[in-house]
C-alpha cells in the first residue's frame, strides 16, 4: 500500500488528498475504473464539504471498464453490470456535473500490453463506440454521448508512426461518431490526452530515457494532443524521484515554450510521407474494426479471448525481436555500457507503515459515524443494483455522505453481482519461439531445457503468478509463452493471488520452481510471505522474482532465500537458462536437506 498510488478508502482520505486545493478552480483527472462508483462519490462529497457543488467541479474520470477486461485487469464485476455502472456515472455527471468528463477511453494500456499503432487504435475506438451505444440505449442523444468522451493514447518511439496514429485517430473518430448519429462539431472532434511510453523505459542506463521521453513528447505534440504526461526517466527502477518528476514536467514545458513546436496546427499536413502513412493506418484500423464486429462486437471479442490472444502474440513478437537484437534498444541489446551501475537513488516507501496508518484512519471514521445510516444507505445501493432502478452513482454518493468506505460499497454491490472470474488464456504456442528459430542463444536455452527434461523424465515445471493487487500481466504472459516454447511445463495462475494460494498451487502441480512477476512495488512483503508459506509446508522448490524493483530489494530478497531475480531487459533465453540452473541446484540439495 502506498507504493503504486494513493490509498482512498473514505471521504476523509479524499479531503486530505485535496487539502488546500480549491476544487472549483482545479480540474482533476482520476484513473479509476472498477471502483469508480465509491471513488467518484467520495470526490463529489469531499468537494461538497469544501463548499464546491457538483456543477462547479471539473475534470475527468477514466471509467473505461472494457479495457480492464483486455489489459489492465482492475475489474470487479462481470461486463454487463459494469457497463451499467459506466452509464450511471456518465448520466449522473451529465446532469449534475457537466464540467466533469465521464469517460476517458484508453489506448495507452493497449500499447503497454504490446499492441502496435493499428491494434491500439482499433481496440480504443471500438470501446468508444460501445460506450456511445450503451449511453444511447439509456436515452442520451448521440451528440451528447460522443461529446462526453475523451481519449487517452500512448506515444512510443516510432516517431512518424505515432504522429500518423494520432492524426488517423481523429479521422476515424469522426467517421464513427457520424455513423452513431452525431452531427455537432464537438461530438465529432476527438479530444485526446497522451502519455509517453512506459514500456520503452529501460532500467539499464536510465538517463537514456530522457531522450526517449523527449522524442515521444515531440511526436505527441506534432500529432495534436491536447494534454500530455511525460514519464520520469527512473520509472523503470521504482517510483519516480522528485528530481526526475520535475525533469519530466520541464521536458514538455521546454518543448512548449522554447521550441515553437506548438505554434502551428498539424504541421505535417501535406507531407506525402505523413499523409500516406496516416491513410495506411486508417485503412488497417478499419479492417481491424470489421474483424471485431465479426467476433460479435467488442464484448464478445473479450469473452472469447480474441483480444487477449492478439495482444499476447504482439507482445511476444516484440520481446523476441528485442531479445534477438532485431529491434535495437540502446543500452540494452546494443551499445551496452561496459561498466553498468545501479547506484541510482530511488524513492522508497514503507508499505507496512502506510497500511497501518490507513487502518487507523478507517477505524476512526467508522467509530464516528452513525451505523444505522450507513446500513440503510448500503442496503439502498444493493437494492438498486438488484432491481435496476435508480442511479448507482447517486446512491453511492449517499453512502459516502454517511461515511461508508470504498470497500463497504463494493461489498454491497458484490452481494448482488458476483465478482468477475477471468480465465487464464493459453500461453500461446509459438507466440515467442516462432520468432527466434535459428537464433543461437535460443537454441542453447531450449537445448538445456531439453537435457534437463531427459534427465528427470518430464518437462521442468514452473508456476508463474502475480501476488496481491498487481494487474499488469504483460510480462508474466510473455514469459509464460516463451518458457512453454522453450520446453517448460507452465502453469500460469489467475491474477490477484495470495502467498498461501500460490504455495498450494505449486505443491499441487508438482512444480520444480515458482516464478513471481511484480510490477506494483509490493514484492518485499508478499514474496517473503510466499517463502514463509513454502517453508511451512516443507516445499523445497526455489522461488524467482521478475519485474521492477530496486537493486537493494533484490539483494534483500536473495538474502531471504530467493534463488534469482530478473530485472527489466533480461533476455528470455537467459531466464530459461537461469531457471534450469536453479532447478538443478535445488535437486542436488534435496538429499542433504532430507538427511538433516
PLM region spans:
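Short beta-strand/loop segments at the ligand-binding rim of alpha/beta enzyme cores
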Residues: 189-192, 458-461, 536-546
Amino acid at each position: 500500500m502506498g507504493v503504486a498510488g494513493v490509498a482512498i478508502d473514505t471521504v476523509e482520505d479524499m479531503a486530505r488528498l485535496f487539502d488546500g486545493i480549491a476544487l472549483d478552480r482545479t480540474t482533476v483527472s482520476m484513473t479509476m475504473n472498477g471502483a469508480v462508483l465509491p471513488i467518484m462519490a467520495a470526490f463529489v462529497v469531499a468537494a461538497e464539504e469544501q463548499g464546491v457543488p457538483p456543477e462547479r467541479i471539473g475534470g475527468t474520470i477514466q471509467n473505461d471498464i472494457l479495457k480492464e477486461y483486455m489489459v489492465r485487469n482492475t475489474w470487479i464485476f462481470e461486463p454487463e453490470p459494469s457497463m451499467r455502472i459506466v452509464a450511471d456515472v456518465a448520466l449522473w455527471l451529465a446532469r449534475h456535473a457537466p464540467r466533469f468528463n465521464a469517460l476517458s477511453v484508453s489506448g495507452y494500456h493497449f500499447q503497454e500490453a504490446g499492441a502496435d499503432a493499428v491494434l491500439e487504435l482499433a481496440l480504443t475506438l471500438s470501446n468508444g463506440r460501445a460506450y456511445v451505444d450503451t449511453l444511447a440505449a439509456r436515452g442520451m442523444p448521440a451528440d451528447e454521448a460522443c461529446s462526453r468522451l475523451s481519449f487517452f493514447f500512448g506515444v512510443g518511439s516510432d516517431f512518424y508512426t505515432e504522429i500518423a496514429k494520432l492524426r488517423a485517430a481523429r479521422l476515424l473518430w469522426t467517421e464513427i461518431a457520424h455513423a452513431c448519429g452525431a452531427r455537432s462539431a464537438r461530438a465529432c472532434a476527438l479530444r485526446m490526452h497522451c502519455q509517453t511510453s512506459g514500456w520503452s523505459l529501460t532500467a539499464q542506463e536510465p538517463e537514456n530515457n530522457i531522450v526517449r521521453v523527449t522524442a515521444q513528447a515531440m511526436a505527441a505534440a506534432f500529432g495534436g494532443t491536447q494534454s500530455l504526461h511525460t514519464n520520469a526517466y527512473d520509472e523503470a527502477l521504482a517510483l519516480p524521484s522528485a528530481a526526475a518528476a520535475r525533469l519530466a514536467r520541464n521536458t514538455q514545458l521546454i518543448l512548449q515554450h522554447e521550441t515553437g513546436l506548438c505554434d502551428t496546427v498539424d504541421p505535417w499536413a501535406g507531407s506525402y510521407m505523413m499523409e500516406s502513412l496516416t491513410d495506411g493506418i486508417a485503412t488497417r484500423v478499419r479492417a481491424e474494426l470489421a474483424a471485431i464486429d465479426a467476433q460479435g462486437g467488442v464484448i464478445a471479442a473479450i469473452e472469447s479471448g480474441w483480444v487477449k490472444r492478439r495482444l499476447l502474440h504482439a507482445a511476444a513478437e516484440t520481446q523476441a525481436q528485442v531479445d534477438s537484437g532485431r529491434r535495437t534498444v540502446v543500452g540494452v541489446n546494443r551499445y551496452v555500457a561496459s561498466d553498468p551501475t545501479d547506484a541510482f537513488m530511488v524513492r522508497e516507501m514503507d508499505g507496512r507503515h502506510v497500511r497501518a496508518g490507513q487502518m487507523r484512519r478507517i477505524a476512526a471514521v467508522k467509530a464516528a459515524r452513525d451505523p444505522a445510516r450507513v446500513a440503510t444507505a448500503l442496503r439502498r445501493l444493493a437494492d438498486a443494483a438488484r432491481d435496476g432502478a435508480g442511479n448507482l452513482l447517486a446512491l453511492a454518493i449517499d453512502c459516502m455522505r454517511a461515511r461508508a468506505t470504498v470497500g463497504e460499497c463494493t461489498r454491497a454491490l458484490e452481494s448482488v453481482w458476483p465478482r468477475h472470474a477471468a480465465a487464464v488464456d493459453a500461453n500461446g504456442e509459438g507466440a515467442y519461439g516462432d520468432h527466434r528459430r535459428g537464433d543461437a542463444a535460443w537454441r542453447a536455452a531450449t537445448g538445456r531445457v531439453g537435457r534437463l527434461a531427459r534427465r528427470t523424465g518430464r518437462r521442468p515445471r514452473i508456476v508463474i503468478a502475480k501476488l496481491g493487487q498487481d494487474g499488469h500481466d504483460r510480462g508474466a504472459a510473455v514469459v509464460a509463452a516463451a518458457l512453454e516454447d522453450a520446453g517448460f511445463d507452465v502453469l500460469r495462475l489467475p491474477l490477484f493471488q495470495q502467498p498461501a494460494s500460490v504455495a498450494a498451487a505449486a505443491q499441487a502441480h508438482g512444480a520444480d520452481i515458482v516464478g513471481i512477476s511484480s510490477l506494483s512495488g509490493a514484492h518485499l512483503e508478499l514474496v517473503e510471505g510466499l517463502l514463509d508459506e513454502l517453508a511451512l509446508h516443507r516445499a523445497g522448490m526455489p522461488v524467482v522474482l521478475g519485474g521492477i524493483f530496486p537493486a537493494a530489494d533484490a539483494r534483500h530478497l536473495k538474502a531471504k532465500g530467493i534463488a534469482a531475480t530478473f530485472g527489466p531487459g533480461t533476455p528470455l533465453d537467459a531466464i530459461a537458462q537461469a531457471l534450469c540452473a536453479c532447478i538443478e541446484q535445488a535437486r542436488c540439495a534435496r538429499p542433504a536437506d532430507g538427511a538433516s
